């Protein structure tokens, strides 16, 4: 059975399946969506500010978000979202890094004007295989309320 807005609790944390980024995935994403040399050119990246190729923070953000969505935890409640706030790329993600993601419910606010919905703020955090936090962001989710009870 799916969960509606009122079924979630502040402080609740959900885990998602981890993912590993390889060099090919990093290069393919960056060439299309974030074409900076430290994401697209292995040789140039060696002499760059990070001492080697690193993944785009936007790729990491997308994959962390995707893994939580794929977990199904928000399948019933989600009506999309009006925004993302406090995006922080905390550490580079390098080829071979395995990232695990968690999502924590920060706040739940039923709408005063539309009783079938509300807003839920969810903090996503991604950690590498050494358990170092590499990314953090907060989504603003428009969430369905169960109006049949």
Over which residues does each language-model region extend?
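HotDog/MaoC-like acyl-thioester-processing domains
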Residues: 3-10, 89, 93-149
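Hot-dog-fold acyl-thioester-processing enzymes
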Residues: 1-83, 146-149
